[in-house]
Amino acid sequence: VENIQNFIDLVKVTDNEGVDYYDFTQCNPIPDELHNVHEGSNTIDGVRCDAWYEDDDGLRPMMDMIKDNLIEKYGTYKPIDWQYNNWGTKWGDCETWLMSDTITKDGRECSFHFDSAWGEPFRLLNDIAIKFNLEITNEWFIEMDQGEGKSSYPWTPEDTERIYNEHEEALNQMRETIRSL
């Protein structure tokens, strides 16, 4: 019961209008240094760039020195790459809501509903299960009847290492393929 409460306390967020919502990415939030980074292809003041800042000071290309520093700290300077590396998908959870919260003499069970892009956030869910000592079952559905399934977390330490390594290798291979185009 306490483990679930600790999890809920961390992921329950109140917005500027006083409305509560849930955000699983609070368990492993994107680093502040990557928050205002935009990526793609842009030309700012005649400088072509693939990453830039957009804030109250306007648009500024990201300097190579900053990129190198972020790569050293986080393995990337691109927010989407960080999310894939740490959550297992492009976004963590979106539009998350608590469907049920049941406490019995045997324990506590909560059910959440959330959306995610391009697959379940398997790394995020596995890391949450490990961090909070929870058993998580995720039932997922791909839009337009493209598939469905069920995943259980946490994985064993051996499976966690193997799956994370396979995921990282696949991402690196995909990035290399894109760079070669």
Show where each model-derived region lies:
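Intrinsic low-complexity, intrinsically disordered or marginally ordered coil/linker segments
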Residues: 1-181
